[in-house]
Amino acid sequence: MGMKLNSFDLVIGFDTEYVRVDLSQEDENVPANAVPIEEQIKAGNRVVCYSVAIYNPATGQKTSACQNIEPLRAKRWSITTLLQKTIRLANKHGLISTERIQRAEQDNDKIKIALAAHFSRADLPGFSDFEKLKKRFDAVRKTYATVRNPAVFQPKIIKRRPSFCSVRLYDTRLLAPTGSGSLDKLGALLGIAKLSVPEVENKSSQMVAGITRMDIVQRDHPVEFENYAIRDAQIAVSWLIKIDEFRENWNLDNLGPTIGSLGAAKIRQVLGEDECEFLGLEHGPTSKRRNDMVFKSGIVNNISFIANSFHGGRNETFVHGIYDSEPQRPYLDWDLAGAYSTGMAFLRMPDWSNPIHTTDLEALLDIDTCAVAQVKFEFPPDTRFPSLPVDAIEMGLIYPLTGTSYCTGFELKVAQNQGATIKVLAGLKFRFRTDNERRPLVDFIQAVNIGRAQSRLDSKTHSSPLELLYKECGNSGYGKIAQAVARHKTTPGVHTKNVFNTRTGEMAELEGSPITNPLFAAVITGLIRAVVSEILCNLPSHVQVVSVTTDGWLSDATTEEVTAATRGPLCTLFRQLRTMVSTDGSDEIVELKKSALKVLSCKTRGAFTIKQGGPLPETVILARAGYSLEKHRGSDLETSLEFVRIFSERTADTKMLRRDFISIREQWFYAADLIDIPKNITLNLDFDWKRQHRN
């Protein structure tokens, strides 16, 4: 039976409120970074309350509660105590019957509980038994959730007799759309406002944000405190209910722990009986289980060569400094429409049994095949935007005039059209089968787009929760196809991604997903890079191109010039794919995202609006180059202008304060509360020299 919300007896959202110990000391003027990290970890937090929101998925009944505790470690609850008190409360309010609790006194009829939290690794350490608890859930993207077996607890609910409870932990942060990862944003999507707490006076008679001193809020504003604490638990439950509604709409059997897992499940569903043939999988010699299947020989024998041709996006900045636009030529930020989902539509059923090895350039230029190659190349010296990627390891991809590249056939096509001299050192391609021309991922992308269309609001500025979930699942599909492909690379550099296994306390190599395929990953990313490169090289020479970031670019090209630049063979292919996946059959392949009249460009992924204007005058270009401001600004424009000020006044000694949480590995080994560690880092908004300046 699949794990759906209605397969649980209870859904329990939970939250803890706490205050950092160093902020509740007598001397509050001592900066946090003056305290050694080891002491901060040891001091941890003071938990002041536990709050729960309870939901019965069978009846729709709900209730909630908040329980204050003394802020001492000795007074912390165990998770078993939380379950005991919560199930008793649910029983009192009719959400679970006494008879059901008594049945669970037998191990074969456990009470099934879905435990929902938002960023669970902030809350789980608030339990007294975290030392044991940390091994009973799985680490997923720097937080905790249940991926494998549920945890079993035995709270004493009726007459001190233990009842067996099977608990699956869901972290709503892992189930949130991009840009909506905070509780207040999830609440806004649901129409449930995340509450705030008032400012409070600390021991130094200073007014500080209440969220930093929840112990004082609890004492001086008890009603606001309780409402705030309960609301956080309610939002977690409500979002999990929305995720289950999404699962039901998409006809999926399981409520996965992440949005990516839901996307992968849908891809497998639409693949149906073509799944193994499409992905190039077959049963191994010792097992017939799906999880034990292996790649066919056509992939296995060439897996490192294929993986060497798998890269990320094209990310470069071409200028450095502040740039004013010319009259009637504002800076426009363009994106490829649905880049990766459209790229996925290229894939048909490969003939895995007949890999073709060749050094014939013409054979690799066939853009109706899946081709990868290692080549030596040289572009004409006046080429503005060379198009063959070279992995510069720590610098990422660079695009030199001459060098050796692992690339795809799509990129070779663009380079040839630019007049590059190309020598193929090794090449490999797979043709598509002629007896089965199905494009399986088109079915997936259409399911995404149909779901988005059906869930769309009338508003042009707001999206519904379901629309965002469909979009996120569509975007996650490519990520699952590419998961752990890089570990097969043999080129210089560290390509293996290690993850921490909380069940064992050891580091482990990230494994592929059920739909990982190295050739598909290489081909999809190669197609996107090739299309973007073709557009760049087709722009007129007078166009000022500021930067390119994966599937978009910033330049002062007019709409007409951009349209003319999208008429090459790769853009034509991309346009054909676009018609297959767009709900209205549109073949538009570019979309305008932002505009500005004056911009700062400093480095890759570092660009800022100085003066708004152009066709989208309310938008702000804000690529922060990995930095964030210590103090929040009221708008994106204010944030952008503050970065411009910092850039203009910076010196070689300029520092920026950054607060990073201790790693999940550190937290696990110390059984520590979640704390952040302030660090002063040297600011680097300088040109990154992925290209050589010419003037």
Task: Describe the role of every protein-language-model region.
Residues 1-13, 29-31, 324-327:
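Structured nucleic-acid-interacting core domains from mobile-element enzymes and related host factors
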Residues 8-20, 332-334:
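Two-metal-ion RNase H-like nuclease active-site motif
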Residues 12, 22-23, 109-110:
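Papain-like cysteine protease catalytic domains, especially those used for deubiquitination
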Residues 16-44, 474:
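An active-site-proximal beta-strand-loop segment
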Residues 40-119, 124-695:
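Conserved acidic
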